[in-house]
Design a protein with these regions (language model features):
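A metal-dependent, Asp-based hydrolase signature
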Residues: 51-81, 97-104
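Conserved functional loop/turn residues at catalytic and ligand-binding sites
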Residues: 16-21, 53, 106, 115
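Short amphipathic alpha-helical interface segments enriched in basic and hydrophobic/aromatic residues
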Residues: 38, 62, 83-86
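Active-site neighborhood of HAD-like aspartate-dependent phosphohydrolases
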Residues: 2-47
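Short, acidic loop-to-helix structural element flanking the phosphoryl-transfer center
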Residues: 7, 84-117
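Short glycine/serine/threonine/alanine-rich loop segments
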Residues: 39, 67, 107
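Short beta->alpha linker loops
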Residues: 25, 49-53, 77, 90-94, ...
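Hydrophobic packing residues within well-ordered alpha-helices of enzyme cores
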Residues: 30, 58-61, 95, 120-121
Length: 121
């Protein structure tokens, strides 16, 4: 007896790092901010921040480097840099092929930008 496969009716994308290569922008923005205070943003610090909520990562950064800014101020500044950088993001391998395939089959595909929570078509 053949196995029935579920029918895909909708797809919601996480743009950051799935369809667009945005990860380097977070590092670039953070490095630019901490450099103003005489610090570098290295892997030992970044690895402690990955996977956490933005505010928790910001606290780790500010406290570890003893930056003279509040975590919220860092996030605000980083966000303004990301807004400038994101339009230059390159598609991840296979992203265009996947989105074109879904479009060809009429599957709605809204996407979400995780850093803002914005969902759009």
């Amino acid at each position: 007896m053949p196995v029935a496969h579920p029918v895909i009716t909708h797809v919601i994308y996480d743009m950051d790092g799935l369809l667009l290569d945005t990860e380097p922008f977070y590092t670039q923005a953070t490095q630019a901010i901490v450099a103003r205070y005489g610090h570098t943003f290295d892997w030992s610090l970044k690895s402690r921040m990955i996977g956490k909520k933005a505010i928790d990562s910001a606290r780790i950064l500010v406290e570890t480097l003893r930056l003279p800014i509040e975590p919220e101020d860092y996030l605000c500044e980083r966000e303004s840099m990301l807004v400038e950088l994101f339009p230059t993001a390159k598609a991840m391998p296979g992203a265009r092929r996947l989105t074109e395939h879904l479009a060809h089959h009429g599957i709605p595909r809204p996407w979400q930008a995780v850093h803002t929570g914005e969902i759009t078509n």
